[in-house]
Amino acid sequence: MKDFLPFSKPAIGDEEIAAVSEVLRSGWITTGPQNQALEQEFCQATGARHAIAVCSATAGMHVTLMALGIGPGDEVITPSMTWVSTLNIITLLGATPVMIDVGRDTLMVTPEAIADAITPRTKAIIPVHFAGAPVDLDPIRALAQRQGIALIEDAAHAIGTAYRGEPIGQRGTAIFSFHAIKNVTCAEGGMVVTDDDRLAQQVRSLKFHGLGVDAYDRQTHGRAPQAEVVTPGYKYNLADINAAIARVQLAKLPELNARRARLAAYYLQQLAQHQLPFSPLNTPEWPHQHAWHLFIIRCDEARSGVDRDRLMQALKERNIGSGLHFRAAHTQKYYRESYPQLRLAQTEWNSQRICSLPLFPDMTEADVDRVIAALKEIIEQ
C-alpha cells in the first residue's frame, strides 16, 4: 500500500529550523524581539495599523470580545458553520451566540441573514472567511456601521486572502490563526489586527495579565519591574520560539499560497474531467484572491451512492486522509441541548456532506491524481 497521504502537512523547512535554533541560542525564548518583528511584518503584509500576537486565534477572539465589553445580556451574531471556539468564547463571557445560516455553496454568511438576526441586544457580528475565500464584506461593513455594531472578522482561514483588491486585515478588526494546518503556522499561535487604536491597546493589555507591557518591554525599555495592572487579564502571549517560525512562514506565504492555488485548480479540472458526482464549493462572485486553505467537496449519497462518513472511511482505507470543516456548531451536544429549536437548513445540509480533501503546499499533482483515482474507485464500488 502507498504511504499515507495526510489531509494537511505543515511546510516546514531548514529556514524554520534555523530560526528556532537562533532563538534558543539567543537566551530569550519567550515573548521578545521575534514577536515585535512578527507584528511589524504582519502589519506590512496586511496593511493593518496594529497587529498583536497571541498564543492562538481562540485567545485573540477572547480578549477582543472582552475589550469590546461583550457580556451577559449581549448577543453576538455568528455562523454555526464554524469551529466551536467562537461559540464557546461568547458563551463563557455570558453572552448569547445567535447562530445564522450560510450560503449553500459558499458556506459564508450573507448580509441578509445578518440583518434578519439583529436585535436591540446585538453587540457584535463575527463573519467567517471560509476555506480561504473572503466573505462579501462591503454590505456587512455598511450594515454594522449603520447599526453601530462591532464587526470582528474571523480570518483564521484567510491569511493571504484579499477582497476587492484589499488584503483581509487591512481595515477593521480581524483575527488570524497560526495553527498547525493553517497557511502560515508556528504550531500554535494567532494574530489580532485592528485599525482601532483604543481596541489595540486594550487587547495588548488583556493578553498579558492586564499589564499592557511584557517582560521584554520592561527589560529593554527600562520600565519598573512591577508594571501597573490596569484590568484583570490573561496570559495569552506568544513565545519567540513560535514567532520565529511564523516569521519565516509569513515570508514564504506568497509562494505557499501559489502552490495551494495550483493544486486547487488541478483538483477542479480533474473533478470535472472525470465527471465525479462531488460538488466543490463555489468561489465568490465578488473580486477576490483565494488563499485555498481548504479544498472542500460535498458528498451527496443520492448522487454518489455513498454518504460522507463512508467516503471518509473508504479514503482512510486507501491511506488517504480527509477532514470535516465543520460539523455545525448547533448540532454539537451542548449547543443542540441549549438551542433545541434552532434549524439552519443550508448549514445542516452541508454539515452532513462536506469533506476536506488533502491540500498542502508540498503535495504534487500525482498526489491529486491519487485522490481522484480513489474517489472514482469508491463510487464505482
From Swiss-Prot:
Keywords: Aminotransferase, Antibiotic resistance, Lipid A biosynthesis, Lipid biosynthesis, Lipid metabolism, Lipopolysaccharide biosynthesis, Pyridoxal phosphate, Transferase. GO terms for molecular function: pyridoxal phosphate binding; UDP-4-amino-4-deoxy-L-arabinose aminotransferase. The keyword Nucleus does not apply. It catalyses: UDP-4-amino-4-deoxy-beta-L-arabinose + 2-oxoglutarate = UDP-beta-L-threo-pentopyranos-4-ulose + L-glutamate. Its EC number is 2.6.1.87. Pathway: Nucleotide-sugar biosynthesis; UDP-4-deoxy-4-formamido-beta-L-arabinose biosynthesis; UDP-4-deoxy-4-formamido-beta-L-arabinose from UDP-alpha-D-glucuronate: step 2/3; Bacterial outer membrane biogenesis; lipopolysaccharide biosynthesis. It is an enzyme of class 2 (transferase). One of its GO terms (cellular component) is membrane. Its cofactor is pyridoxal 5'-phosphate. Homodimer. This is UDP-4-amino-4-deoxy-L-arabinose--oxoglutarate aminotransferase.
